[in-house]
Amino acid sequence: VKEEGGNILVEGGKLEGAGYESGCYVSPTIAEAENHFKIVQHETFAPILYIMKYKELDEAIAMQNDVPQGLSSAIMTMNMQEMEEFLSVNGSDCGIANVNIGTSGAEIGGAFGGEKETGGGRESGSDAWKVYMRRQTNTVNYGKSVPLAQGIKFDF
């Protein structure tokens, strides 16, 4: 991110101390980035949150849909029009689209599968014939807090 002109807002890293002795826990990196950055366009499978500026919802959806992957997406809004646009055929092109819930993996109980380069579950699984349909798991949270999977908390 830094090499392409972005800023690291929160430096991630290995968690240490009581409860983290195994060395298998990390804190996320939060970075200001632009959609054309090479790292943004690649599926890193790392705890990195990219913050990108936009003016209109259509611009944000276009940035999201411009990456080659399409597993999971999320929007945080209480605006019903924005929610409907994001969940519509004109919105997220991911296999999983969430409203007011992050892309934590808790949505795996739905009709799971990615799109574009993240489509292995649909193309090789028992639902392979359904790849010719556009399905999407939608989760909408009307609460005042954002639930995270497995009790995860981001206390910075």
Model-derived features: positions:
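Basic phosphate/pyrophosphate-binding loop/patch that engages nucleotide-derived ligands
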Residues: 2-7
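Short beta-strand segments
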Residues: 9-12, 75-76
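Short, solvent-exposed loop/turn elements at beta->coil junctions and helix N-caps
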Residues: 12-19, 102
